[in-house]
């Protein structure tokens, strides 16, 4: 069993983009930014508990940080992890929070 404290640290934010909007409309898939060390099992448990929905599958990928120039120095942005969470048929997550 995963601790409640860990579940709250796994999901960082929803990832909003054109592709994530298309996935949400067509495939019932929601995209989240997650902790870099989060596993698929932790992501599935966190989404199921926090949003009270049934999760079918989780796909993850790590985006490598880009190299950026700041003046004469070269810096690097941090790596981050993205998770595509497919919800069960009929399940839905509303981020707008309409009343």
Swiss-Prot record:
This is Large ribosomal subunit protein uL23. GO terms for biological process: translation. Disulfide bonds: none annotated. Part of the 50S ribosomal subunit. Contacts protein L29, and trigger factor when it is bound to the ribosome. InterPro entries: Nucleotide-bd_a/b_plait_sf, Ribosomal_uL23-like, Ribosomal_uL23/eL15/eS24_sf, Ribosomal_uL23_CS. The keyword Ribonucleoprotein applies. GO terms for molecular function: rRNA binding; structural constituent of ribosome. Belongs to the universal ribosomal protein uL23 family. Keywords: Ribonucleoprotein, Ribosomal protein, RNA-binding, rRNA-binding. It holds the Pfam family Ribosomal_L23. NCBIfam families: PRK05738.1-1, PRK05738.1-3, PRK05738.2-4. GO terms for cellular component: ribonucleoprotein complex; ribosome. One of the early assembly proteins it binds 23S rRNA. One of the proteins that surrounds the polypeptide exit tunnel on the outside of the ribosome. Forms the main docking site for trigger factor binding to the ribosome.
